[in-house]
Amino acid sequence: MSYYQGNDSRKITGGQKGKNRDKRKYELGSPPTETKISDKDIKEKDRVAGGNFKLRLRYASYANVYDPQSKTAKKVKIISVLESPANREYARRGIIVKGTLIQTELGKAKVTSRPGQDGIINALLLRE
C-alpha cells in the first residue's frame, strides 16, 4: 500500500468528491524511518525528489558525540534511549529521533541530527 499525501477524496459531509485527475508520483510519501539500537549500523539508500538520495539509518550502534567543554567529538557506543520529546512510546520502544536523550559510554547526550534523513547520529554531550 502506498502513502498518498494529496487531497482527500471526501467532502466535509462525507460524500465523494469528483475526481478530475489521477494521482501523481510527487504526491506519494514513505513510512517513517524508526531508527533503533542494534549491534551494527544498517543504512538504506532511498531515491527522493529531484533524483537525490537520502541515507536512512534503520539500526544504529554508535553516535558521534560532541563535548562542548573539551571541544572534541568522539565516536561512542549507544547504550540506551532515555527519553524522546517526539513521543513517549519512542523511548520505551528504543527509537531514536532528533532531540532524543540517549545514554552513551561518555554519559547522557542529546541527538542533534535526524537519523532517518541523514543516515548518521550526531549528539551533544550533556553535563549535569
UniProtKB/Swiss-Prot annotation:
Disordered as annotated region, ranges: 1-41
Highest taxon, organism lineage: Archaea
Gene Ontology CC terms: ribonucleoprotein complex; ribosome
GO BP term, example: translation
Zinc-finger found in the keyword field: no
Molecular function via GO: structural constituent of ribosome
Family matches, as CDD domains: Ribosomal_S8e (cd11382)
Keyword Ribonucleoprotein assigned: yes
Keywords: Ribonucleoprotein, Ribosomal protein
Chain segments annotated as transmembrane: none
InterPro entries named among the record's database cross-references: Ribosomal_eS8 (IPR001047), Ribosomal_eS8_CS (IPR018283), Ribosomal_protein_eS8_arc (IPR020919), Ribosomal_Se8/biogenesis_NSA2 (IPR022309)
Complex and partners: Part of the 30S ribosomal subunit.
Family per record: Belongs to the eukaryotic ribosomal protein eS8 family.
Name assigned to this protein: Small ribosomal subunit protein eS8
Source organism of this protein record: Sulfolobus acidocaldarius (strain ATCC 33909 / DSM 639 / JCM 8929 / NBRC 15157 / NCIMB 11770)
Organism classification: Archaea, Thermoproteota, Thermoprotei, Sulfolobales, Sulfolobaceae
Encoding gene per record: rps8e
